[in-house]
Amino acid sequence: MQPSSDTSNEPERSPLRRYGPIAAILVVIALVAGASVVMSGDDEGDDDLAEDTPVDQGYPEGVVTWSMAQDDESLDAEFPDTCDPETGKVAIPFFFAPECTATVEPDPDFTGPGVTADTIKIVLWLPNESDIIFTFIKQALGFDDTVEEVKETQLGLVEIFQEYYNTYGREVEVEFVQASGNMNDSVAARADAVKAAAMEPAAVLGGPLLASVWTQELHNQGIMCVACPGIEDPAPTSFGLVPSETQLNIHALNYVTAKLQDKKVEFAGGDLNGKDRVFGQLVLAQSENSEENARELRDDLEAEGVEVVKDFTFALNLGGAAEFATSTVTDMKEAGVTTVLVRGDPITLGDITREATKQDWFPEWVMITPQLLDTNAGAQLVDKEQWEHAFGISYLPPSSEPELNPAYKLYEWYHGEPPPAEGSLLLTYPQIALFFTGLHLAGPEPTPETTRQAAFAFPPTPRARTQPSLNYGTELWDGDVDYQGIDDLVELWYDPEATITDEFGNEVTGAYQYVDGAKRFYADEWTDELKVFDPDGAIPKLTEAPPEEEVPDYPSPAGG
């Protein structure tokens, strides 16, 4: 393996077999957040809506929220029985329950893409049962959900939101497109997208996570795509959940300049502590723009007085990265690097950290939202002598008990039993919840334009510790148009002595500790206080929701 930029006797196994579960979890970790590892390089692009259409117009015409009605009695709004008058929110035990909207009869003559007077059609993507990546995902997470069980669970979730969210008298019709190839098969993905588009839906939910041509094809046809693989310019129809690389750069810039700039090395090994910090950077190429984004972060840091003396961007190589590791470690060590900024994967970092130990070089490893490295399972793949010097930021919340999963609680509350595809629930519910929230707030005339308008008018979801906060539009990021979702991050550090159950359900030694009980921070909230490697207030996982994050207790429709 070569950087794209610089400044035993065990039977032989194929690289994919050797690393298959790990590569799959790179996908899963993004799926848990509801979006793709193939992230958009920059989500601030030209908006294809009319140039004279303002980005922030408030809610679309016909939408009356609970708070609007309380502020203006002349609206004379009526709300459905599914509204809780105590909270003004939809009456379900769901952390992301939106504000109630008033009952409005749709115009019987209105039609839109995938919309009639009494129906609205969506297409849900399903994996191919024989997809080797889907099989690896199931093996890695230890569940045996079938595609049919995933389908049944999705329909069960649609049923819940259909009953409680405002669809303005329309029944949501669900059709499915099952992948004809593996998740990384671009040819199959494009053909499947054409098939989905031919169904003429109002929206498509999900997609093959390693084939962004799926999203691009739907985008080219003007079809709304929710939690689909990321593309460079999502405006105005594609909505993701994971932060863009540009947004992650802003977090990294603010974190480094606030907490590490002009300070002595404190958390390294060997003879590095006490020296002035000298920075290097390692970035995994996640999109065609990754190298450019890495260069922009380096330039932005240097503009703030933080020199990055060595800078490497690399591609994931399932066959290993020994040659790259040797040259990279040698270059950084000879350049006097004390602190390495890492946005990488555990496969490559496994080779790099083992080489660093071999060369007796123990720098600080600062994670700037890496892929899988910020999970306990991923951390098992790197050299422990090195990783005890690791800390940084992540958009993933700590691991938690299944009962803390908002969708698990909601499904069991409504249906009276756990979801059929319990193991993969985190892979299936976010896009459904996001779509119905957009529909709930888009008003009686749902179109890609009114849905976008609703998403941009919707305020950021509540700040929490068990869940990230999501927002779309221009309220954050200095007014840049945001088509991604997650905006706040946690701070964490690696504790080599902690024992925990990892994401596979395995008992492991070595776990991440989350600063201040997993408190989350917007990009402009990072301060100069550095509490990594301080056990006071740190937690390795969430075992219960904080009192302020408890959801209301409503009678179950299933009885009991």
What positions do the PLM features span?
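N-terminal export and membrane-targeting signals
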Residues: 8-27
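C-terminal region of N-terminal signal peptides and the immediate post-cleavage residues
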Residues: 32-55
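N-terminal extracellular/periplasmic Venus flytrap/periplasmic-binding protein-like
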Residues: 51-188, 192
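Solvent-exposed, acidic/polar segments of extracytosolic/periplasmic ligand-binding ectodomains
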Residues: 56-109, 113, 118, 460-560
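Extracytoplasmic ligand/sensor domains, especially the bilobed periplasmic-binding protein
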Residues: 78, 201-312, 364-392
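Beta-alpha junction/loop-to-helix N-cap segments that form part of ligand/metal-binding clefts
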Residues: 148-155, 163-245, 314-323, 350
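Short, charged, surface-exposed loops that flank catalytic or proteolytic processing sites
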Residues: 170, 440-453
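Extracellular/periplasmic periplasmic-binding protein-like sensory domains
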Residues: 355-430
